[in-house]
Amino acid sequence: MNQAAAPKVSFVSLGCPKALVDSERIITRLRAEGYELARKHDGADLVIVNTCGFLDSAKKESLGAIGEAMAANGKVIVTGCMGAEPEQIEAAYPNLLSITGPQQYESVLDAVHRALPPLHNPHLDLVPAQGIKLTPRHYAYLKISEGCNNRCSFCIIPKLRGDLVSRPAGEVLREAEKLVKAGVKELLVVSQDTSAYGVDLKYAESPWQDRNVRARFYDLAKELGELGAWVRLQYVYPYPHVDEVIGLMAQGKVLPYLDIPFQHASPEVLKQMKRPAAQDKTLARIKQWREICPELTLRSTFIVGFPGETDSDFAYLLDWLEQAEIDRVGAFKYEAVRGATSNALPDQVSDEVKTERWNALMARQQKISARRLKRKVGTRQQVIIDEVGPTVSKGRSKADAPQIDGSVYLTSRRPLRVGEIVTAKIERADAYDLHGSVAGF
């Protein structure tokens, strides 16, 4: 007797690493129920599109992905941030099977079950203990909370994902332990506001191994650092207690890397942005951090052309960049997002000026990046291998997060493996990347 074919689902995941984790959770549940993943839409029984709705450009990309799925398959379920305000999606594609907002895993699964029932009851042994991951096997995103309590004027994330909801520390650590046991070498800690972790739980303790651990940024980072993997902290707001984790970096417990979205430097612009810690003595803190941990790498993002940003404000930002010597920078031209309070601010900046300022900032940052990378020539760096080539392999140092930072290009006299961590001698640097060879051979 022929066995019925397992139902197949194609999946599109758009947006940030937090959304990628949402996709991984949905896929893990589907695989546990016997669904198979199809590589192409036309080879699937239905398609799920996890959308991004933060910027208009992201919404355009999401609508395009939905359109491609409809054209290739016709049976489409939409979820994610753009689904929180479904009117635009419904107007463009009225025949979708379902539209849900972010984190609504059960609603997505219910929609799948209605359109494409599973063949049999769930068998949890169909999936590995660490769940299904969409990243390469050697690194994984570890989401520690949902939502955000901040009300930055340019952002609608709290409207889409709600207020901060932290996971108990023990739960996070158990997931991290499973990932490391499955071969993950690098844990990328993500959330909307990583350093606010545990505020909503009042830093409550939860059991982990033979002890209790508080749901607190420092405590969690310290415990993660004991698992034997690289631990990279991302989306960290510069609250005062962030100073505490610098010591962990100096001790080698977590990677000497902080991803802090400063967004601007001008006090007036920060005030209009309603950014936390807007009046902080940030330059003095950065100097102190580097005194404690000289190997510290700082990554940040900035918005140029925010309403009311003057030539003086922008000059202040460029000067601040020179003094701060931020290692890695991403910059965005301000874009009005429907529902953001910054849309109502006076003195909107023209697109032409935004482009001029973006080009000027990136040119300045390129010089800063090249200067800082040049200091690493002649040093030895640990590098995790992402891609193996016939003559040159590509990896990342402790200073490089996947997808967003630079790379280290290496030659080696012996074969390398993806996920392997090697010691490399740095021989050359350019504006964003390092070049060298595997040491000791």
Curated annotation (Swiss-Prot):
Record bears the keyword Acyltransferase: no
Top-level lineage group: Bacteria
Keywords (A to Z) from UniProt: 4Fe-4S, Cytoplasm, Iron, Iron-sulfur, Metal-binding, S-adenosyl-L-methionine, Transferase
Catalytic activity: L-aspartate(89)-[ribosomal protein uS12]-hydrogen + (sulfur carrier)-SH + AH2 + 2 S-adenosyl-L-methionine = 3-methylsulfanyl-L-aspartate(89)-[ribosomal protein uS12]-hydrogen + (sulfur carrier)-H + 5'-deoxyadenosine + L-methionine + A + S-adenosyl-L-homocysteine + 2 H(+)
InterPro entries: Elp3/MiaA/NifB-like_rSAM, Methylthiotransferase, Methylthiotransferase_CS, Methylthiotransferase_N, Methylthiotransferase_N_sf, NA-bd_OB-fold, Ribosomal_uS12_MeSTrfase_RimO, rSAM
Cofactor note: Binds 2 [4Fe-4S] clusters. One cluster is coordinated with 3 cysteines and an exchangeable S-adenosyl-L-methionine.
Group of enzyme by EC: transferase
Annotated GO biological process: tRNA modification
SMART domains cross-referenced by the UniProt entry: Elp3
Protein's cellular compartments: Cytoplasm
Record's keyword annotation contains Iron: yes
GO molecular function: 4 iron, 4 sulfur cluster binding; aspartic acid methylthiotransferase activity; metal ion binding; protein methylthiotransferase activity
Pfam families from the UniProt entry: Radical_SAM (PF04055), TRAM_2 (PF18693), UPF0004 (PF00919)
GO cellular component, one term: cytosol
Major site of localization recorded for this protein: cytoplasm
Binding site residues for [4Fe-4S] cluster 2: 148, 152, 155
MTTase N-terminal domain segment(s): 7-117
Co-factor(s): [4Fe-4S] cluster
Annotated Gene3D superfamilies: Methylthiotransferase, N-terminal domain, Nucleic acid-binding proteins, tm_1862 like domain
Domain TRAM: 374-440
EC number: 2.8.4.4
Protein residues bound to [4Fe-4S] cluster 1: 16, 52, 81
Family: Belongs to the methylthiotransferase family. RimO subfamily.
NCBIfam families in the cross-refs: 30S ribosomal protein S12 methylthiotransferase RimO, MiaB/RimO family radical SAM methylthiotransferase
Function per UniProt: Catalyzes the methylthiolation of an aspartic acid residue of ribosomal protein uS12.
UniProt-recorded name of the protein: Ribosomal protein uS12 methylthiotransferase RimO
Organism from which the protein derives: Rhodopseudomonas palustris (strain BisB18)
